[in-house]
Regions:
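Long, low-complexity, Lys/Arg-enriched
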Residues: 1-50, 66-114
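Gly/Ser/Thr-rich loops at beta-strand to alpha-helix junctions
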Residues: 54-64, 84
Length: 114
């Protein structure tokens, strides 16, 4: 089993723009992964690439780089910064622009109640 768990959560920004929230979690006991762990890591099925994707989780910069690359077909890609919100780092639409900060509240996990 891969030590990087990915979850896609349908969500929307505070302004009501729909997007998909890609949350990752590192499941090792010490919270450490190796570069080899991204080999074969696939995005969850059912992602709607006609919407944007916000990536969120605590992990190394090279994991973020890999996930941004994998999410490239999406309308836009943002990285969550807890101090700012979602910072758009790539876009294929006029809806948002690179460097734009989208305000959002973190969604609950799909499997959680409430």
């Amino acid at each position: 089993m891969n030590p990087i768990q990915l979850e896609v959560i349908p969500h929307q920004t505070q302004e009501g723009m729909p997007y998909q929230h890609l949350r990752f979690q590192i499941t090792t006991d010490d919270g450490v992964i190796a570069p080899a762990d991204i080999k074969g890591l696939k995005l969850p099925e059912g992602i709607q690439f006609n919407q944007g994707i916000v990536i969120e989780g605590k992990g190394p910069i090279w994991l973020y780089g890999y996930l941004v690359h994998e999410c490239h077909p999406a309308a836009w890609v943002g990285c969550y910064d807890p101090r700012l919100g979602a910072v758009v780092v790539a876009t294929h639409t006029h809806e948002v622009s690179v460097s734009q900060v989208l305000k959002l509240e973190l969604p609950a996990s799909v499997g959680s109640k409430g």
